[in-house]
Swiss-Prot record:
Putative transcriptional regulator. This is Putative transcriptional regulatory protein MJ0173. The keyword Transcription applies. InterPro entries: Cro/C1-type_HTH (IPR001387), RNA_pol_sigma70_r4 (IPR007630), Tfx_C (IPR029291), Tfx_DNA-bd_arc (IPR004645), Tfx_DNA-bd_euryarc (IPR018384), Tfx_DNA-bd_sf_arc (IPR036657). Keywords: DNA-binding, Transcription, Transcription regulation. Signal peptide: none annotated. Belongs to the Tfx family. GO terms for biological process: DNA-templated transcription initiation. NCBIfam families: PRK03975.1-2, PRK03975.1-4, tfx.
Length: 137
């Protein structure tokens, strides 16, 4: 049933049942195992998902045609103009407008920002499809 995935058939089944609202105890009874075993299966599934996500993130950063280092002291409100200018120079249309970009930065780079100022430099990766990835230097 599993095509090519980091998840086992059992992990997929457990995640689907949990999404439907079943408890670990209910799933354990259905599958003829212990609640502790279901807990471990679910935990390992989530770990595998996180590793897969991080692998894709690393790959995207390697393949990104453009990365911009946002320097310490930069006003957050200046960042969209920096990003749009660099993307335009490379012929890449960014998928975000100014407000969406500021929100993305706020969500993904909050540890680098204090009030409206960058306190520690970070990078913004611009992917070929116009998507962005925000992360450490």
């Amino acid at each position: 049933m599993v095509e090519d995935s980091f998840l086992t058939d059992t992990q997929i089944k457990v995640l689907k049942l949990r999404k439907k609202g079943l408890t670990q105890e209910e799933i354990a009874k259905m599958l003829g195992t212990s609640r502790a075993n279901i807990s471990m299966i679910e935990k390992r599934a989530k770990e595998n998902i996180k590793k897969a996500y991080n692998t894709i993130k690393i790959y995207n950063r390697i393949m990104a045609p453009l990365s911009i280092e946002i320097e310490e002291g930069t006003d957050v409100l200046e960042i969209p103009d920096i990003v749009f200018k660099k993307a335009d120079e490379e012929g890449i249309k960014v998928k975000y407008n100014t407000l969406e970009l500021i929100e993305l930065i706020k969500e993904n780079a909050s540890e680098f920002i204090e009030k409206r100022t960058v306190k520690k430099k970070f990078k913004i990766y611009i992917l070929e499809n116009g998507d962005l990835d925000v992360g450490g230097s």
